[in-house]
Amino acid sequence: SLGRTLEILAEVIKDRKQEKTEGSYTAYLFTKGKDKILKKVGEECAEVIIAAKNSSLEEIRYEAADLFYHLLVLFEEMGLNLTEIAEELNARRK
């Protein structure tokens, strides 16, 4: 499921942040800091929009995956976890 996949990816991201894995793009983002991470989130948002404008499902899938990944990096940088996001979404359904 998407939820489990995101949980696993979030754990990998957390590990890369803590271990500062050499050659890791994730570790690089954390080294560069919040501004770099925010820039990447913005870029990926724009790329999802462009993919949708192009009506390309393949492009949307690819860019959405990039956006999910960069959002997870941002969440880790900010100390936010997926459970908190899920709780917010669930609260909105009421």
Give the ranges of each region predicted by the language model.
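Flexible "arm" and connector segments at domain edges
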Residues: 1-64, 68-94
